[in-house]
Amino acid sequence: DNVVVYLTVLTDMTTLNTQTTRGPKQRREREKEALRQVILDAARELFVNEGYENVSMRRIADKIEYSPTTIYLYFEDKAALLFAVCEETFAKLAKRMESISRKSTDPVETLKRGCRAYVEFGLKYPNHYRVTFINHPDLHLGRENYLREGSMGMKCYSQLRANVEECIKQKRFRHGDLEALTQLMWAGGHGVASLLITKPDFPWVNKDKLIDLMIDVLIDGLKA
């Protein structure tokens, strides 16, 4: 009985020690992730308002009231920080697109909803969109890094491509050039999103009407 009691106490102490050790570690991880997000948010805002070329790591550090050394603990250089900002945008977009794909079995309907979601995403997160799609981050990162294999950017593009490919396989479109059609759909959505974001004072018609019309014109023109 004493052995059983001893083993029980020992087990409880081990569990307590593990929980005690795990608690501070988990807290540190949360704090680390929170600070990383603060850095990303500050960098995104500065890149939009002042231009990537004009923003230094020290400028970002000043904004969040930390030393530049702290930022370098999270990001190797400014290009790595820009890439992380873009990846965050693509990750948000990819998650939205995945949700749409799961809820629809009709590839054409999925494509329509995806195009609308793309534009709506840009309007909901204009700073994310500006940095990632309008301010030419590829010029600073290099095309091979901006759209490198395994990146969230390529994941988003691959989702769109797979959707268009399914429309072609089911003979829903009369054209079969997969790459051209994928790029066309992206260009259409980007055109509307970027103009609505960068030209807010233009006398646009109702935004929903404009988005729906763009989608209908593109897809109806492709239907078999």
Regions found by a protein language model. Name each.
Residues 32-43, 60, 85-97, 160:
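Generic hydrophobic, amphipathic alpha-helix propensity
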Residues 123-162, 180, 201-204, 208:
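Short secondary-structure transition hinges
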Residues 14, 144-146, 168-215:
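Hydrophobic/aromatic-rich alpha-helical bundle segments in the mid-to-C-terminal region
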Residues 38, 42, 46-80, 84:
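Helix-turn-helix
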Residues 1-34:
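N-terminal intrinsically disordered/low-complexity leader segments
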Residues 84, 98-128, 181-185:
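Hydrophobic alpha-helical connector segments
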Residues 85-113, 143-150, 156, 163-166:
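Amphipathic alpha-helical linker/stalk segments
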